[in-house]
Regions:
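Residues at the C-termini of beta-strands that transition into short coil/loop
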Residues: 14-16, 67, 137, 156
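Extracellular/periplasmic solute-recognition and catalytic clefts
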Residues: 1-27, 50
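Periplasmic binding protein-like
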Residues: 9, 122-168
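Conserved short loop/turn motifs at secondary-structure junctions
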Residues: 25-26, 104-110, 135-138
Length: 168
């Protein structure tokens, strides 16, 4: 209602939080740095936001949201499908050959499912790898993540206060 009023006091700021995927570095194949980099570089975050999330979010390139007290994180792993394929080949899986499989775990939510499906498709299209999706109810999901029973898990961090240190 306020948003539609002339001279409205309504103001909307970006969400002080980041949703991301946690990769378990203790189990293969995500124990390999090149695999982790390849997975990251094979994700078109801007396309994901524009299509799956209908432009309602800011693409995350860092755990710290942009403009958190003037902090602008660098885009360390931008979308780079060619480099992603090179890194996967360096890890021993050229064009996805010999890929041992991978499982992405997320908690029950239609948006989480849509994002997981989009990632699964991007990884298939760019890297030619298969990724299984596992949906878990909240308590089961928390137990899986707490006990490190996952390869990739959906995570999030919501800031307690507006300062980049809150995300470190």
């Amino acid at each position: 209602v306020y948003k539609e009023m002339p001279d409205s006091p309504y103001m909307q700021e970006p969400y002080l939080g980041t949703y991301y995927y946690l990769l378990n570095t203790l189990v293969p194949p995500t124990d390999n740095l090149n695999v982790r980099k390849a997975l990251s570089m094979a994700v078109d975050r801007d396309k994901l936001n524009a299509t799956v999330l209908k432009g309602t979010n800011i693409s995350a390139y860092s755990i710290t949201p942009p403009d958190t007290l003037g902090y602008y994180p660098p885009k360390l792993f931008s979308y780079d499908p060619d480099r992603a394929r090179e890194l996967l080949a360096e890890a021993g899986y050229p064009n996805g050959e010999g890929w041992p499989g991978l499982e992405l775990t997320y908690n029950t939510s239609e948006d989480h499912r849509k994002i997981a499906v989009a990632l699964q498709q991007m990884w298939k299209d760019v890297l030619n790898i298969d990724v299984a999706l596992t949906n878990q109810e909240w308590k089961v999901y928390l137990d899986s993540v707490t006990n490190m029973h996952f390869q990739i898990a959906r995570r999030g961090w919501i800031g307690d206060y507006v300062d980049p240190n809150n995300f470190l």
